[in-house]
Every structure is written in C-alpha cells, then in structure tokens.
Amino acid sequence: MGDNKNNGDSGKLLYCSFCGKSQHEVRKLIAGPSVYVCDECVDLCNDIIREEIKEISPKRDEDKLPTPHELRKHLDDYVIGQDQAKKVLAVAVYNHYKRLRNGAIKDGVELGKSNILLLGPTGSGKTLLAETLARSLNVPFAMADATTLTEAGYVGEDVENIIQKLLQKCDYDVEKAERGIVYIDEIDKISRKSDNPSITRDVSGEGVQQALLKLIEGTVASVPPQGGRKHPQQEFLQVDTSKILFICGGAFAGLEKVIEQRAHTGTGIGFGAEVKGEADKATISQILSQVEPGDLVKFGLIPEFIGRLPVVATLTELDEAALVQILSEPKNALTKQYSALFEMEDVELEFRDDALQAIAQKAMSRKTGARGLRSIVESILLDTMYDIPSTQGVIKAVVDESVVKGESAPILIYENTETQAASGEQ
C-alpha cells in the first residue's frame, strides 16, 4: 500500500475506487493492488464502524447489572463515609434498573419509579454519589441547578432543558438517554415561600415543582434536536422520562427546626417540659434522618412533588477526620490528582500528615465541607506549579503544616540533594 497524490511516473489521473473523486479533489489517495481509496472514504468507514460499536455496547452493558453490594463497593472507592446513604442509593438504583430490564409491569403488578431525594449539608458528597453511580453503571449523567429553573413561558431555564443536557451527554442518542441519571441540585431552593398556597404566581418556587412533577414521574418530553430553539415547524426528539432516574439533592437549611418542632410538640415549655443538656442535643444529621413527608410539606415542597421522590437518604456532616480521608484515600483523591500533575514534570509531590490535618481544619473553618478542599490545595500549590516547569533539577516538592498556614513555601528538593524553599532562595 502507498500514498498517491501526484502520479508523476505515468501521468495518469487516479480516482478513488469508492466515491470516484480524482486525486486532485481529495487530500490523500491510498493505493492498493489496482484499488484506490481517498481519505474522505476512510473517515466515512470509521464513522460507520463507530456507530455500529455504539449500538452494540448498550446491549452488552445491559447483560451486567451490578448488585447493591457491588454498587456500594464502587461508591466506597470514591466516596468517604455516608454508609447509610450509600446503602439506600445502591438498593434504589438497583431496583430502578431491574425495573427497566424486566419491564415496568410484572405479573400484572406495576412497578413504581424509585426516584431519590438526598438531604445533606453543602460539601457532604451528594453530587459525587450521583455522579459515581452513573459512572459505575456506564449510563449518561446530567446535572441541573434547580435555582435556574422557571415555569415554561417565563425568563429562565425550562425544565425540559434538563433532558436536553442529558441528550447532549450521549450525542442525542434517545435510547441511551432514556437509561440515564439526572441529578437536580439545590432542590430545597424551589420550596414554596410560605406554608399556605399563594394567590400570586410563584414561577421559581411552587411553579417549578409543578413543572417538574410530570418530568420526574414520567412523560414524553419533546426536545429540539441538537439543542436548537423550539418552533412550530420543527421535528422534536421524543424522550420517555419514565425510564430516567431522577436524584434530587439539597441542604434543606432550617428543616431540622421543623422536625424538632414536630418531635417536641407539647413538651417544650412549662413544668412538664423535658429538660435536655448540651450532651443530649442531637446533630443536624441525626435530626434530618427522622424526616417525614409532613416536614417537607411544612418546609415548602408540595405533597405531589414529595410523592414522586419515594426514596429519601440523609447525608451526615463531614468531620475533620473524614476530610483528611477524603484528601488521601479515594481512588481519585485530591492529593493523588495533584501528585499525577507533578509526575508529568518528573517531580514527586509529598503531603505530610500535619499538612493534611491543617487543610482539613481550614475547610472546617470555612464550613464548605469537601467542596472547599480543592481551592485550598490549589492556592497552596499555585506558586510551585507556576515555577516548576521553568526550574531545572527539581525532583521533589514537600508540603507541610507551615505551608498550609502560609508561613513558608513548599520545600523543593533538587537532584544534587540540595534543599531550598520554593521562594527562590539560592
């Protein structure tokens, strides 16, 4: 085989044996025994093969449905703690995909959707749990922010845009999208502004809940192809949302007060009051674990919306020890990610134990949970990552407690075993 663009030997004009284009109309013409193929036909063949592989792969994936134990084990590899939430999620997700495989109706019994509501403070791992589950099942995953959603016809994001995001993740393959997972964050922010139904239109609160009802329960959503705007003459992609798993999450700040009020009704004041000391006070996570549908209604979610989210899991606040584990133990731990970046420069990165403790303490003081860890580590290593590509002979960088506290720069170790501070001390 060989490349032919100009046939200088014979002066004969060559043509692609497949599309008939001449050598002057294409970039490359590949020659075989009395046969020629152009680069455009090669690209077309590659596209056809890729499409066929894409059609076969979902069928292969459906053959293997991980058990709840296997799903939990996969979550353990990437998410620290939250044992109860992992168990609840593993069972709900397993049941959902079992329902898809075997049909929604079994022996005349209609199987309901097991959509999930996650309650937990900021940075406790709600998004990561949903993302990790989608990755372990090899299904499309899309995330939406409930605060940007409004009812159709108002300024803001239409709820059907959520399905559009899911389609984008799988190249507008409807069949694949219908097996996907959608995570809607900040769901507590669309709560009704008061307990009583309002006479005015609440387009970003109760209105969004009403708009999400059908989508979460199951409807055929009409989505413009390739993300275009809707217009009457357009053909829409029809997506059956009854097969999509919806996971909604939120911090639900203040919900614990609603639960406490219900739990202690009639015993809060007077001579008959139950006196509790500081040691008897339950944590917010312990209180949230006692949540009932009535509490969520009082918080501002409408009963119909709560009914569409039958599985409720509560995540606990992360303490300092958990944050230290998150920094170093998961498969994609932050310290491992930054070590991999430094390895690309042939530099070893070491975080000492006191540095990990100091980073965790800083995140605790900021009250951002695990979400704030990356920004702390990034700021610590910024100058070092800026200098190292231009600095010769560095083989190791060491981060200790003093670096995290801003008292010194990371220690750089050079090939000649001379140790210097990253501040450029020569």
Swiss-Prot record:
Keywords: ATP-binding, Chaperone, Metal-binding, Nucleotide-binding, Zinc. One of its GO terms (molecular function) is zinc ion binding. GO terms for cellular component: HslUV protease complex. InterPro entries: AAA+_ATPase (IPR003593), ATP-dep_Clp_protease_ClpX (IPR050052), ATPase_AAA_core (IPR003959), Clp_ATPase_C (IPR019489), Clp_protease_ATP-bd_su_ClpX (IPR004487), ClpX_bact (IPR046425), P-loop_NTPase (IPR027417), Znf_CppX_C4 (IPR010603). Gene3D superfamilies: 1.10.8.60, ClpX chaperone, C4-type zinc finger domain, P-loop containing nucleotide triphosphate hydrolases. Signal peptide: none annotated. ATP binds at P121, T122, G123, S124, G125, K126, T127, L128. GO terms for biological process: cell division; proteolysis involved in protein catabolic process. The keyword Glycoprotein does not apply. It comes from the Bacteria. Residues 4-57 form the ClpX-type ZB domain. Zn(2+) binds at C16, C19, C38, C41. Belongs to the ClpX chaperone family. Component of the ClpX-ClpP complex. Forms a hexameric ring that, in the presence of ATP, binds to fourteen ClpP subunits assembled into a disk-like structure with a central cavity, resembling the structure of eukaryotic proteasomes. ATP-dependent specificity component of the Clp protease. It directs the protease to specific substrates. Can perform chaperone functions in the absence of ClpP. NCBIfam families: clpX, PRK05342.1. This is ATP-dependent Clp protease ATP-binding subunit ClpX. The gene is clpX.
